């Protein structure tokens, strides 16, 4: 159950980050149309929903797991969001990024083993 809540937290908060980026990309296109056009976009609402669900999953997870064990696992969001940046937004990801991501994963594995 804890692993499922952690995965749900990661996926929802990662989706929320992607939706926030999609929000600002859309807002650039409709900037001249004012706030009404901006708020008609589905992206900010998806961001709010995903981040809200991520918070709910996180709170449920904290009922079952110590924060000192659970919180480092959220670093995996750096990995998820970087992959989304690469494949959704076609942003460059170089060797430096990949090395950093590998270090994050190694740190999460190391901390996960001691938990």
Curated annotation (Swiss-Prot):
Q: Which Pfam families match?
A: EamA
**According to its record, how does it sit in the membrane?**
Multi-pass membrane protein
Q: Please list the GO biological process terms of this entry.
A: lipid A biosynthetic process; lipopolysaccharide biosynthetic process
Q: Which domain of life is it from?
A: Bacteria
Kindly state which keywords UniProt assigns to this record, in alphabetical order: Cell inner membrane, Cell membrane, Lipid A biosynthesis, Lipid biosynthesis, Lipid metabolism, Lipopolysaccharide biosynthesis, Membrane, Transmembrane, Transmembrane helix, Transport
One term of GO molecular function: carbohydrate derivative transmembrane transporter activity
Which ranges carry the EamA domain?
A: 46-113
Has the keyword Transport been applied to this entry?
Answer: yes
List residues traversing the bilayer: 42-62, 65-85, 93-112
Q: Quick one: a GO cellular component term?
A: plasma membrane
Which pathway does it operate in? Bacterial outer membrane biogenesis; lipopolysaccharide biosynthesis
InterPro entries per record: EamA_dom (IPR000620), Flippase_ArnE (IPR022883), Small_drug/metabolite_transptr (IPR000390)
Q: Where in the cell is it found?
A: Cell inner membrane
Instruction: Please give the family membership noted in the entry.
Output: Belongs to the ArnE family.
How does the annotation summarize its subunit structure?
Answer: Heterodimer of ArnE and ArnF.
Biological function: Translocates 4-amino-4-deoxy-L-arabinose-phosphoundecaprenol (alpha-L-Ara4N-phosphoundecaprenol) from the cytoplasmic to the periplasmic side of the inner membrane.
Q: What's this protein's name?
A: Probable 4-amino-4-deoxy-L-arabinose-phosphoundecaprenol flippase subunit ArnE
Gene assigned in the entry:
arnE
């Amino acid at each position: 159950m804890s692993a499922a809540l952690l995965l749900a937290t990661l996926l929802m908060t990662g989706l929320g980050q992607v939706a926030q980026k999609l929000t600002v990309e859309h807002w650039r296109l409709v900037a001249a149309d004012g706030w009404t056009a901006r708020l008609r976009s589905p992206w900010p609402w998806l961001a709010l929903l995903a981040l809200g669900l991520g918070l709910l999953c996180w709170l449920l997870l904290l009922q079952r797991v110590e924060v000192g064990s659970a919180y480092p696992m959220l670093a995996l969001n750096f990995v998820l969001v970087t992959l989304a940046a690469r494949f959704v937004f076609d942003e460059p990801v170089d060797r430096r990024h990949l090395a950093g991501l590998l270090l994050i994963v190694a740190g999460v594995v190391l901390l996960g083993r001691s938990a």
